[in-house]
C-alpha cells in the first residue's frame, strides 16, 4: 500500500519524472511541487478540494500534495459554470485552473512542506469522480486510496513486464478515472515518465 509513496520519496532527484514542452522535468523538481501543494493543503481549511489542471505533471503534484495534507480531491471533467456550481456545493476550496470567480488556490513561493512522504491510511477517501451523465445528472463516486492502488497493482501485474523504461502519453484526460489510473497513478507507481501535455488524436 505504501510502495507508491515510498518510491516517490526515495527515487533519485535527477531521475526524469516527465516531459514538458520537450524538456525533461527531474524527479527532484517535481517532488518540490508535491511539497508545495502539500503546504498549500496544510493551510487550506476543510477536507475537500476540487482540482482541475491541464498539465499532467502539475496535476499529479497537486494530487499527491492534497493526499499528504489529508484532503479528498474532487475531480471535474471541465470548468463550465454548471460544473463549478455543483462542485461549490460539495468542496471547501478550488485548486488549479478554475475560473477566477472561484478563487482557485495555487502554491506560493513560500510553500515548501517539510513533512515525511508517507502513505495516508488505506481507507482515506482519496478522490471523488463523476459519472458521464449520459443517462442523467453526473453522479459523484467516491474512491478510497486502497481501491485506487489495488487497480494500479492489477495493471502493473497484467501489463507492466513489457513496459520498462516506457514514457506515458495519453489521449484520455486525467480528470477522468481511466486517465487518472493509466496516465497518473500507474506511471507514478512504476517510475515511468509522464508527458505533461495530453496527446491529441487524431
Residue ranges of predicted features:
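A short N-terminal helical cap/helix-turn-helix that marks the beginning
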Residues: 1-16
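Flexible, low-complexity linker/hinge segments
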Residues: 99-125, 151-152, 157
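ATP-dependent adenylate-forming carboxylate-activation enzymes
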Residues: 53, 74-87, 192-202
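Conserved AMP-binding/adenylate-forming core of the ANL superfamily
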Residues: 14-43, 143-146
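Conserved AMP-binding/adenylate-forming
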Residues: 39-79, 166-174
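AMP-binding/adenylate-forming
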Residues: 89-99, 142-158, 163-202
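Conserved AMP-binding A3 loop
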Residues: 24-28, 118, 124-153
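Conserved pre-ATP/AMP-binding loop-to-beta segment of ANL
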Residues: 9-13, 112-130, 161-168
